[in-house]
Each structure stands twice: as C-alpha cells, then as structure tokens.
C-alpha cells in the first residue's frame, strides 16, 4: 500500500505538481525509484533479493498513477496471485488463475514476493535473507493445466499462500510528425550486471523480445528522427550514489554495465543511417554527448535532488571533451559539473532540456499572413536551461544528413 500512498501524498501536497499533471498531457517511463532504489536483475533467473522481486508491485502503482497514458506494445496487465508450492517440486498451483488464457509469451517472468513489511523500503539494513524462502526470480517452463505452472527450479519449502506475480512488458512507441519515440523498459527484463566483466556477452538490460522489437520498429520506421527514451545513461557510468549508501562493489545503473548490448544497438542504429537521439536520466547531472555522427545522448537530471559529483559518482568524467569508458570514446559537448569541494546541500544545480523540432519556416506572401515552407533538412534543437534562473546554458542543433 505504501507505494500507492507515496503517489497520493506527493500529488496531495505538491500543488504545482498536481497542476502540471492536470493540464499538461505527458508520457512517462519508470526507473528504479518508481519501483525501489537500485533494483537489479529482475530477469536474472534464480536471483534472490528483496528489491529484485518488488518489481511488479512498484510497476503496478506506476501504471495506476502515470503509466496508464503511455503507448504500450503489449497490453496484458501484471498478474498477481496466491499459490501453493511444495518443497522439491517445480510446480506452482493457483486455483483462482487460468494460466491457459494468459498470453505468457507476451508477459514477463514470475516473481515470488519477499513478503516482509520492509520489502520495498529504501534502506540497506533490510537487504538481508529474511524474506520468504521461495522468493526468487523464476522462469516459466510450461503450462501444465489452467491452474498449474512448471517453473525452472523446485521450491525450497512448503507454502500454501505464496504471493507471486507475472510481469508485464511495459515498452511502446508513438509517432509525432517526422519523429518516432520509443519508450523502453530498462528495469523489467534487466539481467544482473557485473562491473568486473562489463562486456560479458549476452548480458541484457532490455531482454531479447524488447531488443528485437526496438530494432525492428526502428528499421521499419520512415521517420527522420528517432528518439529512444532510456531511464539510465548511455555513455556515462553511474558508479556512485552521491553520498548515500549503495552496493559499492557492483554499483552501476547505466548502459556502461552492458557494453555488449549497447555496442550491438549502436552498430544496428548506424546501419539505419538516420539520426538517433538517446534521451536519458537517472544521473543527477545533465549532459549532451556525441556518440557517432548519427547517435547522440541527451541526459536531463532530476530537478529536485542534489547533484552527483563526477569525480566520485561518474568515473571522473570531464565537464566537456573526449571521454572513454569501455570500448568506445565519446565527445561530451556540454554538461553540468559539480566540484567535490561543495558541501552536499550546496550541490543544487538542476537543468531542464527543451527539444524543438524545426520542420518548416514561416514565409507568408504578405507580412502577417500564413505560409509554411518545408526545410530541405529539418533539424532538432536541444536547449538546456538553468532550472533556477531560466537562463539558456547550452544548445545543440542536429539536422538530417546533408
């Protein structure tokens, strides 16, 4: 209940936030804080961690309050249920479910929930092994009958009241003019990264179904510009927590923990030959990065959080200039940047990004009239503004290939 109460509390108390939601049509995508902080490995078969199996609870609350308006490729909701599991048996039985009618090939994997009151609390003291003994990430092997599933491994203990869920696929796309927008899910089908082997083949943030959908859709589109909405940074590591507690031994929220998949995406985007803009967040800084001539990253950090310190939290990347972390060098054209001598509560420099697509120029035959003429090469202008003063801090204009 606490997750839903959080949304209600912020909307009740945040009058300006409520007005925004009431008056401005918006699309949203979720990251870890919409579920639970640092939620990793939701698709890592056999993983046991209280944050990991909180995925569907947090995702359902997000859909109830924000995600209901989003375009989605698959519409079947999360399935929640109570089931029976028997020790050493790989069967899960739910008398109230009809698994034969569920489009399981279009849904996620199965999680048995942690079951403690603190399961969704952002506090590392609860990252222990006190949860339900059968709480793991499970692959569904087959439907035995309408009420029974075979899972990839047997239960650890007998339990006649297992709280479980089968996830949904939360990605989708929409088209506005000559721009295609792809809203990807970076948490729901995410395998477990390993910062000691960032280029491990096959480790995926998206999962095979989503990755194949994304690349197929992007190749089939005739849009001039493709916007990929990713909740986590593409080129800059998120390797610190800004002074908060974190799993320092394996901390990285970004695509820099998934080099194999990231580089495969870039290679396929280069084949398309059109502009691809990866719109990212999560890090508490903003930046504009040229990855290739066609692929760019534009990150906008949160508006109400202290900034990260790049020296500590972003693998000591520069404010501008060439930066290489892993197999690919990129060009940081601009960024917000905080020096480490600032006290934590002085690190409050938000920026917001306004994206303007210029397809036509105004050219009336008579002054005051109306006529629009198409540009031979449309352009997209990314404008970063200081969140405190409203002043323009940086702009980057990118046109179609000439």
Placement of each model-derived feature along the sequence:
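Long, structured stretches of catalytic cores involved in phosphate-ester chemistry, encompassing
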Residues: 1-402
């Amino acid at each position: 209940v606490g997750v839903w109460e959080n949304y209600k509390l912020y909307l009740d108390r945040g009058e300006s936030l409520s007005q925004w939601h009431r008056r401005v049509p918006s699309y949203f995508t979720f990251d870890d804080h919409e579920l639970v902080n640092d939620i990793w490995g939701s698709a890592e078969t056999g993983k046991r961690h209280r944050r990991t199996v909180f995925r569907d609870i947090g995702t359902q609350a997000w859909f109830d309050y924000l995600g209901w308006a989003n375009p989605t490729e698959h519409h079947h909701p999360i399935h929640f249920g109570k089931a029976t599991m028997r020790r050493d048996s790989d069967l899960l039985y739910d008398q109230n479910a009809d698994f034969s009618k569920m489009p399981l090939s279009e849904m996620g994997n199965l999680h048995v929930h942690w079951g403690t009151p603190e399961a969704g609390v952002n506090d590392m003291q609860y990252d222990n092994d006190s949860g339900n003994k059968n709480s793991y990430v499970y692959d569904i092997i087959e439907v035995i009958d309408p009420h029974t599933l075979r899972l990839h491994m047997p239960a650890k203990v007998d339990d006649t009241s297992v709280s479980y869920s089968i996830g949904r696929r939360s990605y989708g796309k929409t088209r506005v003019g000559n721009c295609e927008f792809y809203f990807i899910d970076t948490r729901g089908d995410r395998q477990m990264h390993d910062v000691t082997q960032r280029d491990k083949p096959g480790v995926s943030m998206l999962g095979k179904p989503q990755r194949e959908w994304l690349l197929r859709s992007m190749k089939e589109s005739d849009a001039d510009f493709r916007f990929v909405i990713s909740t986590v940074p593409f080129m800059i590591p998120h390797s610190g927590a800004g002074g908060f507690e974190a799993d320092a031994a394996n901390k990285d929220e970004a695509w820099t923990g998934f080099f194999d998949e990231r580089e495969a995406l870039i290679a396929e985007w280069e084949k398309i030959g059109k502009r691809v803009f990866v719109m990212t967040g999560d890090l508490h800084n903003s930046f504009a990065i040229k990855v290739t001539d066609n692929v760019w990253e534009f990150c906008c950090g949160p508006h109400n959080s202290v900034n990260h310190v790049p020296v500590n939290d972003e693998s000591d990347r520069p404010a501008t200039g060439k930066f290489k972390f892993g197999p690919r060098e990129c060009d940081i054209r601009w960024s917000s940047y905080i020096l480490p001598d600032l006290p934590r509560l002085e690190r409050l420099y938000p920026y917001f990004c306004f994206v303007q697509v210029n397809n036509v120029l105004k050219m009336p035959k008579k002054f005051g009239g109306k006529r629009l003429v198409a540009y031979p090469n449309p352009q997209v202008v990314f404008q970063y503004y200081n969140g405190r003063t409203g002043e323009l801090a940086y702009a980057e204009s990118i046109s179609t290939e000439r």
